[in-house]
């Protein structure tokens, strides 16, 4: 089944994320510049998604329509990558099922 594999990271990690996509056999992907904000809001599910504190962060969203195997391998590689990097900005990733497409 086709999946949508989505990764968000700091712009400086884009080269590493490109290598991860390649290792996961994901050869075609798109990128979008994003700026993540976190303000003093009540607790919610996104509290730990962006940086702590009230700053903005230059980030990238990298995504691809890929096989389930590619998405699963990509997630495993992201988990390993996060264990190796230092800092407060881990790479985030998620997978969504693609039920229909035209």
Spans of features found by a protein language model:
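Positively charged, small/polar-rich N-terminal and surface patches that mediate targeting and assembly
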Residues: 1-102
